[in-house]
Amino acid sequence: AILELPQSPNVFHPEKPSAVG
C-alpha cells in the first residue's frame, strides 16, 4: 500500500486488501 499506517490502513484503503495483508 502507498500509505502504510500502523493504526488502521484498512480504513484508508478498504478497497485494497493488500494494504491489510
Curated annotation (Swiss-Prot):
Disulfide bonds: none annotated. Residues 1-21 are annotated as: Disordered. The keyword Mitochondrion does not apply. GO terms for cellular component: cytoplasm. Transmembrane segments: none annotated. It is found in: Cytoplasm. It comes from the Bacteria. Keywords: Cytoplasm. Component of the cytoplasmic filaments that run the length of the organism just underneath the cytoplasmic membrane. This is Cytoplasmic filament protein A. It comes from Treponema phagedenis.
